[in-house]
Amino acid sequence: MKRPFKRILYGGDYNPNQWGKEIWKEDMRIFKDARINSATINVFSWAKIQPSEETYNFTELDEIIDMLSRENYDIVLATSTGALPAWMVKRYPEVARTDYEGRHHKFGQRHNACPNSPVFQKFASRLAGKLAERYGDNPHVTCWHISNEYGGECYCENCEKAFRVWLREKYQTLDELNKAWNTEFWGHTIYDWDEVVLPNALGDGIEDAAEPHMTAFAGISIDYCRFNSDGMLNNFKMEKEAIRRYDKETPITTNMMGTFKGLDYFKWAKEMDVISWDNYPAYDTPWSLVAMRHDLMRGLKDAPFMLMEQTPSQQNWQPYNSLKRPGQMRAQSYQTMAHGADTIQFFQLRRSVG
């Protein structure tokens, strides 16, 4: 594998396709003035690249990559699979997630695909492979960015079937499963693998629980979380394998989220060439907590990591977006470097149109 980076990367997510091309040239000028040397692109462009099941269109992405290559940028190229296109949900409704309440979703938002959908896996792997085939030999592509901020859950029939398979591989026998879950409690003894149901509001979920997604059986809940993490990791590995068919050397990553509990990051780290994560402290987040998260990320591989995202301004999911005081963004970035980062990147280099 190639050495991840020959220089400290300074840049961030760049989505020029949101703007007219007359803005692109100006971006290159002002980015150079700001000494920006890298851009993360194509994070949410699946619908643009693949407007229908049979059609791929790389024309605009070709232009963006050519422009950045001419300016000697390090390109972090994403696979776009963090948000699937509307046509896929319309034609294959099973790719959409079913939530904890048992509601099957329509198209919308992001992180919106069932991780155990064979249809989603097929299209995601195919797209990753096509991107690697087209751009894998570009020397300016210095890192592959698979999907985006893996997380969330699905409780559909595909997931339930996959959960049973996962449990059989783990426990081998129903006796071992019943023992591990203490199913004697409340008369929950399982006599057939098909009797296992997902731990959501339609099954063992506790109504009006103090914490969301609580269930009556901790063992079932913990195993579901492990299964869900493994399922998403399997998707990451599928895309990684598709990339490696055409690009054997460029480092591959996905952006983690610090102390996010939903995934087993220690297990994920074994499959990643370099760790990357997104740092979005709130106005009242202790700096010591941010430091601990940096150390956690560095410790996953005992090696330098990438700061894939941070922001000088706002996030659409924070209850409050406080203005950072003068020098605070610089101090936050220096703290990141001091804890072992090889990159300082932002979301976004140019704000969205709306």
What are the residue ranges of the model-derived segments?
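Short, well-ordered coil/turn segments that N-cap beta-strands
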Residues: 5-8, 35-37, 69-75, 137-142, ...
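Surface-exposed, active-site-proximal loop segments in enzymatic domains
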Residues: 45-59, 87-118, 157-160, 217-221, ...
